[in-house]
């Protein structure tokens, strides 16, 4: 993507999403968490890193997730999100450029209230280094694939759910809900109507 087009895309995202400091509030009584939908350019396209959680973890074992985690006492959601990205995939604190936040999502199975932030990781993008005590690895998924409705499959399982297969992993559950919630504004920023 040409530098001017990339800058315009990022600027539109800032206008479309909630401000980082004014995204709303967590669900009362839930465990608070924050994740980051990190956009970076690789080979002329936008990509997003996801983490594959270890199978022996208590919460969401073996699942693919956006980097993020719990918000500590006295910590803002954005500060928690940046800390977790640094811990989980090795992106230095202060490297992310915040673009905004999506609407919080509640996961009743684990009682997490999650705010998804959108951020840009400018070049040069460092190699992602995952935290082995929590994660099995890092997946890099092209934004175009995440926004392609035909790439998402509806399961035939009685518990019907949507998923995206990528590198022998599935993006589903809470992470699918987060991506689906962010997708309309991401699409709008990529292909804006006149005047947007």
Model regions and ranges:
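N-terminal leader/linker segments that precede catalytic domains of diphosphate-processing enzymes
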Residues: 1-65, 69-124, 144, 152, ...
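Amphipathic alpha-helical blocks and their helix-capping loop/short-beta junctions
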Residues: 129-158
């Amino acid at each position: 993507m040409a530098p001017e087009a990339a800058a315009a895309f990022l600027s539109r995202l800032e206008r479309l999403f909630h401000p980082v400091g004014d995204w709303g509030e967590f669900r009362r009584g839930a465990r608070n968490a924050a994740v980051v939908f990190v956009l970076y350019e690789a080979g002329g396209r936008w990509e997003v890193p996801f983490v594959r959680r270890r199978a022996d973890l208590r919460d969401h074992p073996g699942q693919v997730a956006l980097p993020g985690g719990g918000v500590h006492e006295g910590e803002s959601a954005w500060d928690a999100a940046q800390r977790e990205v640094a811990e989980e995939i090795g992106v230095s604190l202060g490297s992310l450029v915040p673009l905004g936040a999506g609407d919080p999502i509640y996961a009743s199975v684990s009682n997490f209230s999650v705010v998804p932030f959108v951020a840009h990781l400018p070049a040069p993008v460092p190699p992602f280094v995952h935290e082995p005590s929590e994660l099995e690895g890092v997946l890099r998924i092209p934004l175009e694939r995440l926004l392609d409705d035909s790439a998402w499959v509806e399961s035939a399982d009685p518990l019907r759910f949507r998923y995206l297969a990528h590198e022998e992993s599935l993006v589903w559950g809470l992470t699918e809900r987060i991506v689906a919630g962010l997708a309309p504004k991401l699409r709008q920023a990529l292909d804006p109507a006149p005047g947007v």
